């Protein structure tokens, strides 16, 4: 089974690692791809403190560190995984990649009510995905 695990820097996503590990150990053959979609960097005014290139490099560095954290958690459990870092619209990128997988795994939306109502991409992914979606918490 090929599983796309959409990761982010939220507690709910870190909690989803436990579910992913249990799932991996319950299946004979499983391949995980860890996907982090970083937002495109836009700078509207020149502050003189940091330029676009520096900001973009910082965001990429943070994203790579996040992927490494998740990779390490999987390796600790002897689960093979591949990491992919993309930038762009989260929904578009995830749905495009999901076409090549059997299952999409995402962490539950953050607990904060305002976040769930206005920022969460969870509902869009569930409604628009062509493959089954598991929301782990």
Curated annotation (Swiss-Prot):
InterPro entries found in the cross-reference section: Rossmann-like_a/b/a_fold, UspA
Pfam families registered for this protein in UniProt: Usp
CDD domains: USP-like
SUPFAM superfamilies assigned: Adenine nucleotide alpha hydrolases-like
Homology family: Belongs to the universal stress protein A family.
PANTHER family assigned to the protein according to its UniProt record, in alphabetical order: STRESS RESPONSE PROTEIN NHAX, UNIVERSAL STRESS PROTEIN HP_0031
Protein name: Universal stress protein HP_0031
